[in-house]
Amino acid sequence: MTRFPVFQLAFLMCLCIGWMFCPLSVAGLTRRALVIGLGEQQDKAWSKINGDRDVPMVQQMLRRSGFSDIRTLVNQQATKAGIVRALQTLGSDCQAGDVVYVHFSGHGQQMTDLNGDETDGYDEAWIPYDACKEYCSADRGERHLTDDELGVLLSAIRQRIGKRGKLLVVVDACHSGGITRGMEPCGEEADDVERGARNVFSIPGKAAPRGSAGQEEEEWVTISACKSYQTNFELKDKKVGKLSYALCQLFEQHQALTNEQIEAELKAFMKKHPGRMLQTPELTGRKQTMSVSGVFRRARKGQ
C-alpha cells in the first residue's frame, strides 16, 4: 500500500531534475548570433568601407530582442578561417529550437563558378579580411567565402536547430562584381561608399558549364542589401550599412510585421536614401514559412 506513493514521488523528482537541466532544448529559448563586420582588409586594393561600424548597432538591436549569446568578428578577426571556425562553433553549440542570427557587413564580390550551380557563371562571395581583390599567387580564390561554402555551414546550423528553430542570415554587402545589368543611375554622389568590387575574381581555366549542377533552396531566410547583380552603398551621413541601419530602425519601431511588410519597408528605405545606383533589398529562402519578426521579438523582463 505504501509503495505506490514512493514510486510516484520518484517519478516526479526525475521529471523535475530533467526540466532543470534541459529547459533550453525543450523550450527553445536560446537566441544566438554571430555578427561579422569589416572596415579594413589585408589587401589594400580594396576600398575603405565601414562594415565594422555596423557591429555595435546590430549588437544593440539583438540585445533588445532577447539574444543572450552574441559573438562578434571584427576586421582582423574575420579571416576566412576565423569566419568558418566561428560558424562551425556556433552550430555545435546550438540546440533544437534555438533562434540563430548571422550577420555579415563587408565587401562582396562575384567570382568564377567552379561547380556549375550558377546560371550566370559566377558565385557570390563574402570577402574575409585576408581575401585578395584580384587572382594572384597569394590567393587563387581559396580565401573567398563562397555561397556554396556558406550553404554547407548554414545547413549544419539548420540541422542542429531542427524544424522548430529559426535561422536568419543578413548580408549587408555587394554581390554585383563586374555585372552591370540592372545598375540604373539614380544620382551623382561620387563620394558614396560602395561595399563591393566592380571586377570579377576570375580563376583561369576553372569555370564550370553554366547551370550544370543546379542550386539547392535555402532552408533559412536571407535578407540581402541588394540583388546579386546590384551594388550596395552605405548610408553616407552615418557611415554605416543601409540594410543594417534600416533593420535596426525597423525593429526598434515595429515588432509584428509580416515578411512582405518587412521587404516593402526596406525597399522604401533604399528609395528614400538612394546611392549612385539603384539597389533592391530582398528576402529569399523560407520566407513563406518562417516569420522574420519572430526572430526580433522584445525581450521579456528577467530574460
Placement of each model-derived feature along the sequence:
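Bacterial N-terminal signal peptides that target proteins for export
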Residues: 1-11
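Cysteine endopeptidase catalytic domains of the caspase/legumain-like
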Residues: 16-303
